[in-house]
Regions:
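A charged N-terminal "starter" segment
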Residues: 1-117, 122-132
Length: 133
């Protein structure tokens, strides 16, 4: 396990707290990029491998943009997540749409974005043909 260190010291943190109301989140862009590159490198033996970030984990367009820039696709499961992807310029095979109990409008939007649609239930095939196919 690697040592995890904050990218700032106590004095810097106190200045941040003075400026921004709490609670808030701080993300370390340098570390996010480093880890995305390390993951891509770990699977470099697998030609065509692409990591897909689960947007539902943190639907933050800044984080999503960083990961997009590092070659990650976006794993979406809702209309709102598809909208975020479109807003940051991720379309086509940059989106893996995996959803259960999915409204027709979500499948239709995923198709308009030319997303890859991942089905985990054979009974969804006919519904997809009717609404997104």
């Amino acid at each position: 396990m690697t040592d995890k260190k904050l990218p700032f010291n106590k004095a810097q943190m106190e200045k941040i707290i003075e400026k921004f109301p709490t609670p808030f989140h701080i993300y370390d862009e340098k570390d996010i990029r480093h880890r995305a590159r390390a993951l891509r490198q770990a699977f470099s033996w697998n030609e065509g491998y692409k990591e897909y970030y689960a947007v539902k984990a943190c639907p933050n367009p800044i984080i999503m943009s960083i990961l997009r820039d590092e070659g990650c696709g976006m794993d979406c499961s809702s209309y709102a997540e598809l909208m975020l992807c479109e807003a940051i310029g991720v379309v086509g095979d940059g989106i893996m749409f995996s959803s259960n109990d999915t409204p027709a409008k979500d499948f239709e939007y995923a198709r308009r974005l030319n997303a890859t649609i991942n089905l985990d239930d054979i009974t969804h095939i006919e519904f997809l043909k009717e609404h997104g196919g």
